[in-house]
Amino acid sequence: MMAEEQKVLTVNIVTPDGVVYDHHASMLVVPAMAGQLGIMANHEPIITPLEIGEIRVKRTDNPGHEDAIAITGGFMEVSHNIASIVADGAERARDINLSRAQRAKQRAEDAIKTASEKHDSDELRRAQIALQRAMNRIDVKNHLQ
């Protein structure tokens, strides 16, 4: 006998520093490599890599509210109504320090300029990723406001 289909998805986000997020959701949107991917309860099992971007979670305990989380890449596994996200880094929008993110953006822009002048392709790539991460944090924080 089959149990009634659930309409709740558990979303867990973990980084090397520990659990960043753990809530029930009606829907989850993640920045997959192939584009934005929406996940709801009873989704087929899937494992997918994630890019630097914003995760959006529509929570079941507050239907009008959507949580935003900035991630710096990782992967997601969905199985049995649990979405487990393992990310290199993740920060909830409410926890992002905007001035710190803006300083990181400025440092990355300066590093891009220096690396370009030195023709240092490795340093340039690292600086471009740092800029992408800083811009993502700024965008996610601004999305909250």
Curated annotation (Swiss-Prot):
Under Gene Ontology molecular function, one entry of this record is: proton-transporting ATP synthase activity, rotational mechanism
> How does the record classify its membrane topology?
Peripheral membrane protein
Q: Does the keyword Transmembrane apply?
A: no
Pfam families referenced in this protein's UniProt entry, alphabetically? ATP-synt_DE, ATP-synt_DE_N
- Chain intervals with Basic and acidic residues compositional bias: 106-123
Question: What are the alphabetically sorted keywords of the record?
Answer: ATP synthesis, Cell membrane, CF(1), Hydrogen ion transport, Ion transport, Membrane, Transport
**InterPro entries tied to this protein:** ATP_F1_dsu/esu_C_sf, ATP_synth_F1_dsu/esu, ATP_synth_F1_dsu/esu_N, ATP_synth_F1_esu_C, ATPsynth_dsu/esu_N
GO CC field: plasma membrane; proton-transporting ATP synthase complex
Quaternary structure, per UniProt, is:
F-type ATPases have 2 components, CF(1) - the catalytic core - and CF(0) - the membrane proton channel. CF(1) has five subunits: alpha(3), beta(3), gamma(1), delta(1), epsilon(1). CF(0) has three main subunits: a, b and c.
State its role. Answer: Produces ATP from ADP in the presence of a proton gradient across the membrane.
The family this protein is said to belong to: Belongs to the ATPase epsilon chain family.
Tell me the protein's name. ATP synthase epsilon chain
From which source organism is this entry?
A: Latilactobacillus sakei subsp. sakei (strain 23K)
